[in-house]
Amino acid sequence: AQNLKLQSSLLIPRFDVVRQVFQKAGGSGADYRYKYFLSSATFDFDGESYALYDRYQGQDSLYQQMIPMLRTSEMYMIATEVTEDLEEATDYLNTLRVNRGLREISSTQVEQSLEAEWLRELYGEGQLFFYYKRKMKTEIQSAYDPYGTKTINLLRYVLPIPDGETKYN
């Protein structure tokens, strides 16, 4: 049964990386995304500890493949990004954080906390690419080193045009 679960998981990240990503929130144990989707099942392989990502485990394979198009949490983060009123931005982000089991932050912490919330909220979905592209990030959290970063060339954000799009145009 354990082997079957490993094969059906969408992501099996290193546990030390997961712990670091979620501890940035001020205590990983409180964040329900960590508590319910990542901390419950771990295993060791070749001297490393890994977490099983169980966010979309459900009754059938279709449920496991579902990724929401847009969710309320994204709306709060987008509102935080675009509002010019710092107090309003803080309120939006704090609404999200409180609903994730985290403590509120001050207005001086909004910018750094927002990126961390995008990372935690979209963890394992492949959607973080679009945040990084929009912000033109050249350094992102490493997937292999809990305290490291990975340098990204901005050209990596430019996707090739499919042949089918240019053949008849």
Model features per residue range: what roles?
Residues 1-13, 23-169:
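Acidic/polar-rich alpha-helix caps and helix-coil junctions
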Residues 18-19:
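A surface-exposed, glycine/aromatic-enriched loop/edge motif typical of exported proteins
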